[in-house]
Amino acid sequence: MAVVHSAPKYASNDGVRGTLVKALGDYVAASHEKYGEIIITVERDAIEDVLRTLRDDHDYQQLMEIAGVDYPERPERFEVVYMLLSLTKNHRVMVKVSTDEKTPVPTVTTLWPNAGWLEREVFDLYGVLFDGNTDLRRILTDYGFEGHPFRKDFPLTGYTELRYSEEEQRVVYEPVELAQDLRTFDFLSPWEGMTPPLPGDEKADMPPIDDPMVTEGPEDTGAGARANAKAAEGTPADPPAMDDEEEDDA
């Protein structure tokens, strides 16, 4: 009789961080656990060796994602985050490195082929360079796009706009022209408001109104006097009866 094994349950983090930090040794710059995730920061130049160790010796077989984060105030403003999954242990771990605009991060396409597209995405959106990636082209933005749109200093409006020109009968690119500077408005979420509000974001009281506008009848809304008579007719309490043919069609 065949024995059916269920999928492994979500593994506990107990002891995992200590084991991995010990295995990675001097490569580790910092480690912590947050929101149930183990996060290990390592030296940038060691990222390939670190991920190879996690894949080959600790069963993190899959590279699920590579993400970028921008912290403009830091000397090395970018973080590159690698998210690994162990199928056999049903466990995840995140590994991070930091870099700046000019210093490349070693590619991990030597370990996972899918890293090629993931590294291209981080390059396209943040401008992070990956040494050894032989196809480091843009992957999400349009041809001829300038800049990296996920950087914190990239304007929300962008630099160019795309529209269809009736005169030229084609799509054209033009520099963004704003009649006034872009303004952003903070609105409180109906589910989770900010507590306390940001300075200057306090809500103002409504000004007093001496003669409030009220509507006594439909004509006050601009619908005209005939709207009063139509409203007075009302609607029948019961819907009109359908004949047999209409009932059959229904």
Curated annotation (Swiss-Prot):
The keyword Translocase applies. Residues 241-250 have a biased composition (Acidic residues). Residues 222-236 have a biased composition (Low complexity). Its main location: membrane. Residues 193-250 are annotated as: Disordered. It is a peripheral membrane protein. The keyword NAD applies. It catalyses: a quinone + NADH + 5 H(+)(in) = a quinol + NAD(+) + 4 H(+)(out). Keywords: Cell inner membrane, Cell membrane, Membrane, NAD, Quinone, Translocase, Transport, Ubiquinone. Its EC number is 7.1.1.-. NDH-1 is composed of 14 different subunits. Subunits NuoB, C, D, E, F, and G constitute the peripheral sector of the complex. Belongs to the complex I 30 kDa subunit family. NCBIfam families: NuoC_fam, PRK06074.1-5. NDH-1 shuttles electrons from NADH, via FMN and iron-sulfur (Fe-S) centers, to quinones in the respiratory chain. The immediate electron acceptor for the enzyme in this species is believed to be ubiquinone. Couples the redox reaction to proton translocation (for every two electrons transferred, four hydrogen ions are translocated across the cytoplasmic membrane), and thus conserves the redox energy in a proton gradient. This is NADH-quinone oxidoreductase subunit C.
